[in-house]
Amino acid sequence: DKDAKTLTVTDRGIGMTADEVERYINQIAFSSAEEFMEKYKNQAIIGHFGLGFYSAFMVADKVEIFTRSYKEGAKTVHWSCEGSPEYEMEETTEQRDRGTTIVLHLSADTLEYGEDSKVEELLRKYCRFLPVPIAFGKVKEWKDGKYVDTNKDNIINNIAPLWTVKPTEITAEQYKDCLLYTSPSPRDGL
């Protein structure tokens, strides 16, 4: 939301309970994170222990999490932090679908991350081959002399890249599509 100066990421996954937020989000930040990072600095720990989550504070002054677990009777959990060891967390009666929403309140010097073009560029660069569909906006179609959004999600990644398929099962059209999708100058190889 460019006007609100926020970047919001939502999934429809299994969500988290308050105990899980405490364990997975607060565990590193409030249990000697510097010591932990020093100890494991030479190991590939990105994607573990919630460390990637804390990189959000590189672009945000404040981060909020709204999450609701798939577990029966689960309540929505709201977690909020402004980058210090202090945070707020509460269970609310707000009805939300199962899953997690993370809201980054962008800092003044990182507002470019509120621009659709910048977000799409980063998603295509870093999420291009993730095994789950990543939707960003809606597919646009030409109607009455202008592009308009449809109800169809704009999936920006390829969840089944060619290297996951047996070569004997790949068609010439699939090779061509892969080249167009991955090459900076796709016409060179056609």
Model-derived features: positions:
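GHKL (Bergerat-fold) ATPase N-terminal catalytic module, capturing the glycine-rich phosphate-binding loop
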Residues: 1-108, 112-114, 121, 128
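Short, exposed beta-strand "edge-strand" segments with a Pro/Gly-rich flavor and a Y/T-containing core
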Residues: 10-16, 30, 161-170, 189
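Secondary-structure boundary/capping residues
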Residues: 34, 132-135, 189
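Flexible, glycine-rich phosphate/dinucleotide-binding loops
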Residues: 72, 143, 189
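ATP-binding catalytic core of ATPases
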Residues: 86-145, 149-180
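Single conserved hydrophobic/aromatic residue that forms the stacking wall/gate
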Residues: 181-190
